[in-house]
Structures are given as C-alpha cells and as structure tokens.
C-alpha cells in the first residue's frame, strides 16, 4: 500500500482521469475547511489538538499473484482526529474512514475484477431555454428553467394564459400572481403583466425580476409566504416555487429561439460530477455529526466510525452508473476509441425511437470538437459520438481546441477557443504558404463563420485548423479517407475496433502520421520512470540500475487476462547495456511493430472472377497465406479449478482413477495434473479430481468388520475430472497452484487449494473467417486455393486474394484503389509512403490526378516483361492448368488487410434436430441450450453460389417448422423407416406470400383424366 499526504496533479492523457485528481483535491479542501470552521465555532465544546488527512492507495495489482481476477485499486481517505472534550475533560484520538473510491487512471476503472471505461456526457446547463411552435394556428411558448439536477420549472405561455408545471402539479401561474398582487402589491402591476404577455415583449423571468426589484422588502416576502401557507393544501408547492424564483440570479443569460438540446446550452458531465455531488452531501452530514458529537459522545463517535452506509451508497452508485461501461479490449485502438465516447443527449433508452432527426445530425458549430463520421450504429446513431484527437476541457467545463493564425509564421501564437467563441473568427481548413506556392496570388479563401460557409478575402482575422483535427483517432489512420463514402467510412471505423492482434504482422506500405506512437498509446506500454542502464532483459522482466545504484524491476505480465480473452504479449525493445532516460519506452505489446500501429499484412489483391467463389462479399485466398502464418492469432483460455472441503472431507487430485484407459491419463503427472507444454485436444483430462463420499449401508455390523480388517473407514470415491472442450484445442503454457491463504485472506470458505491452467490457442485463418481492409471492405473467406491453382503473371507473381470487381463501385470506397496503386508502387521501389488525407489542399485537384498518372506509368514500366493491358494497372494472367493467357485482364493492387474477431471457430457448431419453442415452433436461441443458429441473407447467398439445392430443401422442410416432416426424418434416421413425401411447411407458405406481394401468383393444380380421356386441372389450395 502507498500513503499519499497530498496527491500530486499529474497531467494525464484523458479528461476524466484529470478530473478525478481534482475531485480528491476538493474533498481534502472541504475537509480542512469544515475542521477550521468547527474549531472557530463558539457552540462547539471541544478543541482540535491534532488532525491529519491520509490518502491510502491500496490493493495494487502490480506483481500480484492473481493474474485473472483484477484486484480493485481503492483510494481511501482517512481522517485522524485528536479532540479535547471540555465537559468530560478527556482527550480522545480516533481514525475515521471518510471515503473509499475506486481509483480511476487513464479512464479505466476496475470494478468486481473487470475493466470498465468511463465515458463522457453532454448535459443541459442550468439556464433558461425557450421553445416556440404553433399548435392549431396559435403561438405557444415553453419556458424551461433548470435550477439543479432533476429540478426544473416549465411555463407554458399562450396569448392570454400562463400554465406552470412544477413538482408534478399544474396550475395557472398568472392567476396566482394577480391574486397575490391584488392583496400585497400595487394593483398596477397586474395591468403591466397582462400587457406584456399580450405583446410578448418580456418573459416570465422579467415579471419575477420586476416584482423582486420594485418591492425588495423582506417583510413583504415573509408575509407573502405566510399567506400562501393559509391559502390551500398545496401550500408547500407554492412556497418552494417562489423560493426558487426569488433566488434566481439577475444576471442569468438565456438565448431565445434556441432548442433545449442546442450545443451552446450544454456542458461536460461525467461520473466525477456524480461523485462530487455525493461527496458534498456526505461531508455536510459528517460536519453535522461532528458538530453534535458533544450531546452523546460515545454514541456519536460510534456513528462517525461506522459510516459504511454512505460508503456503500457511493460504491453502488458507481456500479450501476450508465457512464461506466464494460471495456472493449479487442485491441488497443478499440479501448482508446471507447475512452473518447460522449453521449450528446440525456434522454432515456425508451425515447430514442421518437427523437427528431435534427437532434441526430451533426451541427456545423462543433466542427473540430466532435468527430465528423464516428458515431454509434442503430438506435443511438447520431446520439452517441466521439471526441476528436486534440480537444481539452477548460475550468468552465467547456470543450476548447487550439487554433493557429493563418499567418502563423508571422504571428507565432495559438488561440484557445471554445464552441461559442470561435464564431467571432473566420475558420479555414486549408493552410496558406506565402513562398513558392501557387496560392501566393490568391486573394480569397473558403472559410466557415457562424455555421455558414462563405468565401472571404484573406485577412488577419482568419484562423486555421488542420483537417485532421476534425476527425477522431481511428479516422486519421485511414489513408485517402476523402475518396470513400461516409457510411462506408463509418463501417471501417467499427471494423478497426474488431481487429484481432496477430503473431506476425507487417508494417503497412501506406501510412498516415497517426500510425506512430502518440501520447494515447503510452498507457498501453511499459515506460521507464528513471534514468539508468539496462542490466537484464528477458520475456519476463527488465532490470535497470539507476543513478542511485538501485535495481528497478519492470515485469512483463504476458498472461494478464483482458476482457476478450486475447493474449497480449509484451516484447522488450531495449538491450543489455543500453542507457535509458526518463519516459523511454522499454517494451511494447503485440499491437505495435517497430513503434507503429500494425495489426495486418500487405496482400496482393486481384479484382476479378475466379471459379465463381468470389460471389457477393466472398473472398478467395491462397494457401501461401496459411503456410506463412500471416493471420495466425493467439488466444488465452484459463481454467480455474478449486478443491473444496465438503463435510470435513477434502477433495484430492490423483492419477489413480478407476475405469480410465492409459491414453486418457498419459499426459498427467503423478498428482493427476496435466503437464506444462502438453498439446491438448477436445475431451482431454486437465485435472483428475476425486471426491470421497461416505459409505451408507444398513448393516452396521458388516461395516465394522470391514473397517476392522482394512484398518480404515470404508468410503466411496467419485471421479469428477475436469475435461477440455472443443474450444480448448491448444497447448498448456502455464500452471499455477495457489493455497487459499495467499489470495483470500478475509473470506472464510471451504476452498483450500486452487489450480489455474493457462491454455494458449493458435487460431489459423480458415473458411468462414472475416478479413477487411482500412476502407470498410470486408468479406468472408469462401475458398482456400492451392498455390499451384492460382493464375500468375509472366514474372511468376501470384495474387494473394481474389475479390469481386463490382465490390468497389458498389461501396463507393475509391480510397482503396489509391492505396492499392501506391502500395504496388512502394512494393516495387521498396519504399513507404506517409499520406496526407487531403492531397489537394494546396495544389488544386489536378495534383492528385497527375501524381496517380505518374504512378500508373511507373508500375507499367516496371512490369515491362509482363503482358499488360491497354488500360493502366491491368494485367493479363496465365491459366495455371493450361499455361495459356486468360482472355480478360484484371486489376492488381497491394492493400493492407486485417483479421476480424468474427472467427468461424467460435461461432460454428454442429446441430441436428434439437429443441424447439412450443409457441413459435422455431429453434430455441443460445449456444448453451444447443439452440439454432441465425441463417441470414449472406448465408443464403453462399448456398446460392455453391448451388446447394438439397440443403435448401432441408432448411425449408425438415429443419423448418414443419412438425410432420421432422418426425418423418427422425423415424428414418433412428428406426430405419422409409422416408415419405414431405408436407408443405410454413416457410414455403411464407415464400408464396412474399411472391404474391411482388404480383407473382403461384398456383397448384391436380391433373387427371376424366371419363372421356381428357386432361382436367383441379386447383389445389397450397397455402391453407
């Protein structure tokens, strides 16, 4: 544990982590203030001899033996008091536990052993808002006065009436004011109020201001309250209402004709604000208890010491708070992206259906603060967005961003503007270079001011923001993002959060500036905290000897469990004898390669048809990818087995199992535990667990004779081995044996020993897996071709994958064509390109066309020996079976591809005729219940591509809701009965209904011969 006298404010990469440190500082400040207040209070009959505030950081999970269950990092605030009570003439010293808060660092909070992420919220500010609209050709004004959290007053103003809604009650506020004015205030005020309502010149706030300013007499207000008490049974409502209205500050600023959900009327809100409200409330209770401690000293001291009630309320509030979400840890990018999530509206889940589309659209006034593209899918589309990369929070809880002056070489300073202040400037997204630039002769520039685009002259009032600042972190990783459809870019962002880290990644040939390590990455790396020399490096730890001759050990915990069960491996990048400085990176994880974000490989892509397997979204790959392990990923399964003591009889592990063959126990040691390094398959024994049962027999004399002969009590033992499943085909990489007293020192249970078996699983690329590129183009592997069966060029170059040619124009992601052209050029030149997303910002639109034309020509000249087409970047391939030239040419590109987490091994399973629902007669859902799998549109396309007509028949008949056909199939399989003709299923009837909706009528007729040997058609109703 660590004792902290004063928490030091260290700048963090995330907003909520910095606010958490400020929260601790404010709690300490309030505690000191209350102690000084009580010490100077006359009514207090005790003196403070000594006090001290201790901040205790405990339960640190560094170097912990428990690598599965992440221990909650707790921050405890303890107040040590030494009081001298005057009445009893005694000095009492006691320690009071004020708060227990989970420690928040880098927007990560560990609750119940799980990683969770804190997200942000845009919340309505405490102001006055006005909404105007027409109802039955009548103008109605709604005035919302937000006082505090959950407290608001609503006025509905029509032409001659004002209705007030407060505390679930509705009443006529105008009649109330007129009635009160007639009794206590001048009667001329009523005429003044009436005229102003008709003319619509002032609002209800002005009435209160007028009354309060003209008759600013406390006695009048008190008499007014006394009258309202006698008025009716709802007196408390009016008292609270007038108290609130009279206490409103006169310098309130409000905006007319603005919606409540306007971005100007919102402020930043997070879990820290909720903790601040709870902490202030509890500190006031603590102050009151300390103030009245002298009445009953011993009872009040016990109340102070036993304050678990308030601590548990705060901890429970954090657990159920919707701003604390389950962390997405598929890769580092998905975790970073979730930390920048922000909710734009504060409505509940039930009201997302009825929200207007205007609230979902991204207004222009938040350009640079909220990402242009990145948002959620589904019901929360446009309501949950993500912050940009370079955004900060000021002291007024408003987002600010840095702007440069357009002539920043002359005016070398930056402007820090919020969402409202930036409206006073003309903002340009393209920089101007004064020297050696074609823009030198330009006098006008495109800018945005007050949410409108306009062309204005170049003046000093223009500020500049790079276009990368308008995008989120993931969007800046996509090269040529301008040339893709925005919806396809959104899909690409979601795919980046589903990428699985692989064992052997390669650096991308086409990158952006955001591929390198940024500040946001430093939270996932191991960094040196002192200057020194490396004296030892291994895959387990790094030892550094610092300037004070101390050995500092950095452990690389490669078996740490994360939420998605992906094995995150740390690799040292320093060597023995190297001098390291403060802040230098010592080790990186498997998401990085050479200090760059890289999770995929460069593949040679052929856009064309190959045996029809590339139908729709299907992808054909070469077996060379499997031989080189280009997309092999590591996953970690952990078995946690405990040995219990049941009825004072312990469970044991032994290799002496009854009714077991040698092949089942050959990988076990003498204690019945599987050996490290063993490659296990499905249904292998991991631990042989024996449970002893008492022998129950009615003849006690026989039992006594047996016990006398064998010298021990007769018992029955039962085999309960732990067996691996089909998802555990891998290698045992680590085994831990933990006694109970090492990891569980507080709770008393029947567990006396615990085993942990770590199984490393290599998942290779196989049929059914999904791969994607950086432009939102994903597909399922439909065929793995042999190397000898793939078409080739004259220089023996073969494409790695084949994709349908119509997949690019149908998705409008032209950016992958540009990436493929430059990637192919970089492959020939053995170079890499750092691409700016906006290539035309300084050179007009012709720059990109000329550059592409040059790259096309270079690629053609490099492949001068290959058979080229008349079109650029298109090649003729040879048939691998005949060696002849294939008639049509195809396009070849070099594109960076990833592997997604949607792997067929985790989802695909075998199921025969299983359980069906009694109501719908459809297969039940759920893997644990052996339920049915969803057979969607893309699966139907795959069956159509393979021509699986018999499989279609099974889905429409035997595996559908046709009960009779299912029974016929069951009797055929189990009882060897003859299979009969199938009946008409409900699925087939539904297809007929769908065809009838398309004006396609399908009828059935029974054809037979009549008495005159003429054919007649008898219609048959096949639907009912």
Swiss-Prot record:
Q: Where is the signal peptide?
A: none
Question: Which GO biological process annotations does it have?
Answer: DNA-templated transcription
Name the keywords, alphabetized.
Apicoplast, DNA-directed RNA polymerase, Nucleotidyltransferase, Plastid, Transcription, Transferase
User: What is this enzyme's class at the first EC digit?
Assistant: transferase
Q: Recorded GO terms, molecular function?
A: DNA binding; DNA-directed RNA polymerase activity; ribonucleoside binding
Entry's EC annotation: 2.7.7.6
Catalytic activity, as annotated? RNA(n) + a ribonucleoside 5'-triphosphate = RNA(n+1) + diphosphate
Of which family is this protein a member?
A: Belongs to the RNA polymerase beta chain family.
Question: What is this protein identified as?
Answer: DNA-directed RNA polymerase subunit beta
| Organism expressing this protein natively | Plasmodium falciparum (isolate 3D7)
